[in-house]
Amino acid sequence: DLWWLKQVAPMAEYFPTHILKVSMAWSVSKCKYSFQKMMSMLEPLSKVDIIDQMRVAYEYFPMENKDVDFQFPVLILVGKKDSTGKVKTYCKEWAKRTGYPLHYIKGAKHFSNGDNPEQVNKEIEDFINRIIRKERK
């Protein structure tokens, strides 16, 4: 897996800038709103900026965060239709290994808060309320 992650940034260099941005936006978006929002976030970035961010996300992040132990409550949300790499697989394994709750966002890809904001907000609200109730006991 790590070898493939290191290939993402070099492969992106072969894409024309506009095609790179459009393909990235659609790959994480299920609905038009999310696509447009993602395009607006990518718009000010140059191809070099995007590739630098890919390098951080795909090459460095997995190594730097492999043994992280959070000392606060964690909720894992993942789009039911997320097809970004192995995100769903990794989230499932992370939840299994740590006991963190994992919730799937219906009809959503990787940009799940844009694809289904109602469910994302409800999941977060319910999570916070469970923590508050637990602390009051």
Language-model features, listed with the residues they occupy:
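Catalytic active-site module of serine/aspartate enzymes centered on a nucleophile-bearing elbow/loop
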Residues: T98-K137
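Flexible "cap/lid" loop of the alpha/beta hydrolase fold
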Residues: D1-F15
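Conserved alpha/beta-hydrolase catalytic His-Asp/Glu region
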Residues: E13-Q71
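Conserved loop-alpha-helix segment in the C-terminal half of the alpha/beta-hydrolase fold
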Residues: V74-A108, G114
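Low-complexity, flexible helical/coil segments
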Residues: F15-S29, T89-E93, H110-D115, K137
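Long, low-complexity, intrinsically disordered polar/charged segments
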Residues: Y58, E64-K86, N121-N129
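Disordered, low-complexity tails and leader-like regions
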Residues: L2-L5, S40-L45, F61, V74, ...
